[in-house]
């Protein structure tokens, strides 16, 4: 049977594609005159998957996710999953100054009040999923990224912008059967730090730089400039989440041959779809 999907306001850009694979539950979502959210589920069922990304406006989309969970429970749904393509507050995963919250922990606990299972895409720190009281899984779209770039890279290589992102580069490289490595920072003077790729020769090769989030794009631009100096042929940049600061798309695009992100957040360079991963969750029903 087809799974029942609920599309939140933060995932409207995925609605058309998802509707081809599953039944959409009819819900009414609007605002009261004072700005508060109104949610009403217009159908009945037993199990449902809510899809709600929590990019800007983050707080509004998070509240809506909670209201959808409560409304579905009131409507008689007994098992609820939520897919959050981009989870807000996920980078606030530790206390850096006394008196701060662990914001992502608070979000996880609230979601756990209504949802049995939580699925996120390429969360900043996968260990934070331990705060969710039910089943929680991190999905990394390595296959989708690899399939998009396979005909562009040839016998190229995959690079992570730092060691922390190496696992992402590894997973894409393994799908493509290509070499992978990462950049490291080398201090060349008391005031200057230089990035360099570790143990790989990029001269004459196409290179794909892989990361989880692009915001300002400064790291990617710096990495691309270094690769140019080292003789790289074509340079591609990809991230799961395009959290672009103003002007970032233009700046990064000028520095590389192509910039692409997935559609966890809708942007003008969201060229890689995550919908197949979401649909597979429904097929397990």
Swiss-Prot record:
Its cofactor is Mg(2+). InterPro entries: Pribosyltran_N (IPR029099), PRibTrfase_dom (IPR000836), PRTase-like (IPR029057), Rib-P_diPkinase (IPR005946), Rib-P_diPkinase_arc (IPR037514). Binds 2 Mg(2+) ions per subunit. GO terms for molecular function: ATP binding; kinase activity; magnesium ion binding; ribose phosphate diphosphokinase activity. The keyword Protease does not apply. D-ribose 5-phosphate binds at residues 187, 211, 215-219. It is an enzyme of class 2 (transferase). GO terms for cellular component: cytoplasm; ribose phosphate diphosphokinase complex. It comes from the Archaea. It catalyses: D-ribose 5-phosphate + ATP = 5-phospho-alpha-D-ribose 1-diphosphate + AMP + H(+). Mg(2+) 1 binds at residue 124. Pathway: Metabolic intermediate biosynthesis; 5-phospho-alpha-D-ribose 1-diphosphate biosynthesis; 5-phospho-alpha-D-ribose 1-diphosphate from D-ribose 5-phosphate (route I): step 1/1. ATP binds at residues 34-36, 91-92. The active site is at residue 185. Keywords: ATP-binding, Cytoplasm, Kinase, Magnesium, Metal-binding, Nucleotide biosynthesis, Nucleotide-binding, Transferase. GO terms for biological process: 5-phosphoribose 1-diphosphate biosynthetic process; purine nucleotide biosynthetic process. It is found in: Cytoplasm. SUPFAM superfamilies: PRTase-like. Disulfide bonds: none annotated. Involved in the biosynthesis of the central metabolite phospho-alpha-D-ribosyl-1-pyrophosphate (PRPP) via the transfer of pyrophosphoryl group from ATP to 1-hydroxyl of ribose-5-phosphate (Rib-5-P). PANTHER family: RIBOSE-PHOSPHATE DIPHOSPHOKINASE FAMILY MEMBER (PTHR10210), RIBOSE-PHOSPHATE PYROPHOSPHOKINASE 2 (PTHR10210:SF32). This is Ribose-phosphate pyrophosphokinase. It comes from Pyrococcus abyssi (strain GE5 / Orsay). The gene is prs.
